[in-house]
Amino acid sequence: MAIATSAQLARALYDNTAESPQELSFRRGDVLRVLQREGAGGLDGWCLCSLHGQQGIVPANRVKLLPAGPAPKPSLCPASPTQPGSSCPTPERGCEEQEVYVIPPPARPCSASGLPARSCSPSSDSIYKVPRGNGMQLTASRDVAEVYDVPPNILRAPSSCPYDSPASFSCPVAPVVPQPPREDEAPYDVPLALKPPAELERDPEWEGGREPGPPLYAAPSNLKRASALLNLYEAPEELLANGESRDADEGIYDVPLLGPEPPSPEPPVASSSTDLDTVAQLPTRSSPPQHRPRLPSTESLSRRPLPALPVSEAPAPSPAPSPAPGRKGSIQDRPLPPPPPCLPGYGGLKPEGDPECREVANDPAGPHNEYEGIPMAEEYDYVHLKGVDTAQGSRPLDKAFPVDPELLERGLAERKEALSPEEPLVLSTGDLQLLHFYAGQCQSHYSALQAAVAALVASTQANQPPCLFVPHGKRVVVAAHRLVFVGDTLGRLAASAALRAQVGAAGTMLAQTLRATVLAVKGAALGYPSDTAVQEMARCVAELAGQALRFTTLLDGLLP
């Protein structure tokens, strides 16, 4: 059977497994060359094809004939025999029949008359077709049998680096002159302030009439142009309008201090006058009052130094150095005042053998706190209402008042007339404000104490059980404790030493009487129905009312 060569191709539609030696095995998608079509040699339903150099019959329903390609047209631009680059050799038909894969012939581009021709056929030894580099021609020294077409490295220099990294670009980089840090450079990152117009006119970069070259780093334009439209930060118009009158180093940002400043060489005696001079010089160093901007927030008020309050008495020994000397006039930074002396009208001194006096006397540094030396258990003994009365015999008690409410009010009125300050104190404005505020509070607290004392006395006269008179006793304790708190706060905040002494002594006596009253109420509740315990409670309550009246009258009398 003669086989007629044909260039017809067919594509496999399904997989096929050979069932006889004359049948071909193929997979779906394989391209077969058709040697004889269906029915040509008396083979109905079979085609004679070749695949991978083998010939055999193939079921006609499992392949699909591909349309034949157009016949190659002759080249319109014949290549010159003198130009080897424009020659396009055509592969022979015999080579086509012996190839394993069917590869379409390469394109045949026409070479322009004025352009150098390029070779359109790949190298005979190359396995894969890869695009050529842009504008790169193969040199004669290059290996012809190279598998991959890889462009040479650009500007590659011989180096011992084991890694193949691209060469650096040849773009020039502007040199950066290293600038040493200035001595007065602040550690905080604060934006620069606007330059005045006078400095902008003298800028050498702008005098030549041309802008300087592009800088290496982008900077906001408002640093060189004092314009409100290009301003990156919101600032008051007064600062922009009066930029020339401000200091060069003065900014609109509030930067906190880094640490303590060196102590002033001036003696501590002249601290008050120095602070007053500093306060007087503040308006002269700052901008005019009509152009001063508002504070950014109320938080800045706490960072501004407060002036020291004038003290007419002899100066006390200088305390330990404050961590921030710039705020030595602040109320929060002043040390606590010394303990107030015991005045004749409010009680005598403690005996020599008292452990608290010995502890204060042995301290070489002197008393630093008015609460030092007071044991914590004794200080809050009246709150816990438990334990044995340990402080009952420490101080002699005054004569007890009668239990009758009328006699009690009459005695309180007599004491109020007797307690009038002999000499009015010269107080500062701050002390007067404190007195006005706390004197009004003491009036309301004393009224609540009077109502609670009257209810407690009426309950004891009716011989009521502890479940009824103990709540009245608690009301008495709470009202008196508020008065003690007022005295303690006023004694710490007042600037006058005489005022602190008087208020502190009266508050101390009131606190001791309150502690004795708490213990008496507790004893009356535990010893009910003992008449002795009830009488002791009534006596302590009357004494507490007298001390509260004494304290309230003292604050009223100190007011002008």
Curated annotation (Swiss-Prot):
Ranges of Basic and acidic residues composition bias in the record: 198-210, 351-361
Phosphotyrosine PTM sites in chain numbering: 253
Tissue specificity of this protein: Widely expressed. Higher levels found in placenta and embryo. Lower levels found in brain, brainstem, muscle and lung. No expression in liver and intestine.
Single annotated GO MF: SH3 domain binding
Domain SH3 positions: 5-68
GO terms (BP aspect): cell adhesion
Cited PROSITE patterns: SH3 (PS50002)
Ranges annotated as biased composition (Pro residues): 259-268
Keywords: Cell adhesion, Phosphoprotein, SH3 domain, SH3-binding
Bias (Low complexity): 305-315
InterPro entries xrefs: CAS_C, CAS_fam, EFS_SH3, SH3-like_dom_sf, SH3_domain
Family: Belongs to the CAS family.
UniProt comment concerning the protein's domains: Contains a central domain (substrate domain) containing multiple potential SH2-binding sites and a C-terminal domain containing a divergent helix-loop-helix (HLH) motif. The SH2-binding sites putatively bind CRK, NCK and ABL SH2 domains. The SH3-binding sites that bind to the SRC SH3 domain are required for interaction with CRK and are implicated in promotion of serum response element (SRE) activation. The SH3 domain interacts with PTK2/FAK1.
Protein name: Embryonal Fyn-associated substrate
Organism annotation: Mus musculus (Mouse)
Origin organism lineage: Eukaryota, Metazoa, Chordata, Craniata, Vertebrata
